[in-house]
Design a protein with these regions (language model features):
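A short, aliphatic-rich beta-strand micro-motif
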Residues: 133-141
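Short hydrophobic alpha-helical segments used for membrane anchoring or interfacial signaling
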Residues: 73-85
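Short beta->alpha transition motifs characteristic of CBS
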Residues: 85-91, 151-156
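Short regulatory alpha-helical segment in sensory/regulatory domains of signaling proteins that mediates
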Residues: 63-74
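Juxtadomain coupling helices with adjacent low-complexity linkers
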Residues: 56-65, 97-103, 148-182
């Protein structure tokens, strides 16, 4: 599975430069964690590491519990993909790549709420059949770094309903962030 082969030298400190083209293609940003694997054939493999992805089944269970309580679509994401989803519309978003609008919202940190009065936001790059009119997004912070988000989306877009979802989203994001720190 060799898509690209580039020869690089290791410097005195043992560092290898990953070319900008490869970083851009694989969406590797400065400061992103990478796992390093070795094989018996002398290969060194780098893999993007997602702390939120490590939560796996736990994140899925948390999303299901939150969806049952709120009747909203609940998405738990890392910085690029929807890791866990529950509620109406789950199949459309689970495992999908996040839209640029959502990625930008995650990078802003904190909690962001959009209502039906504004333009609807697609959670993923894939076109959703019914765009949510209201979204509450809370960034998951772990050791001061933004690792992903908890997104609660509501079809009606009513501000009162979104205000009720906001503390639940913040609590979920804080809980998952603290869980990753351990």
């Amino acid at each position: 599975m060799k898509a690209t082969g580039i020869v690089r030298r290791i410097d005195d400190l043992g560092r290898i430069v990953v070319p900008k083209e490869i970083r851009r293609t694989l969406r590797i940003r400065e400061g992103d964690p990478l796992e390093i694997f070795t094989s018996r054939e002398g290969e060194i493999m780098l893999k993007k590491y997602s702390p939120v992805g490590e939560l796996g089944e736990f994140a899925q269970s948390y999303a299901q519990a939150l969806a049952q309580t709120t009747d909203a679509l609940v998405c738990i994401t890392d910085r690029e993909y929807v890791i866990a989803a529950a509620g109406a519309g789950k199949k459309e978003v689970e495992g999908e790549h996040l839209s640029e609008a959502v990625e930008a919202m995650i990078e802003k940190r904190g909690t962001i709420m959009t209502t039906g009065e504004e333009a609807p936001i697609s959670i993923t790059q894939k076109v959703m059949s019914a765009l949510p009119k209201g979204v509450v997004l809370s960034s998951i912070l772990c050791n001061g770094d933004c690792q992903g988000a908890v997104i609660l989306s509501e079809k009606s877009g009513q501000k009162e309903k979104l205000e009720q979802l906001k503390p639940l989203s913040v609590t979920a994001a804080n809980f998952l962030g603290k869980n990753m720190e351990q």
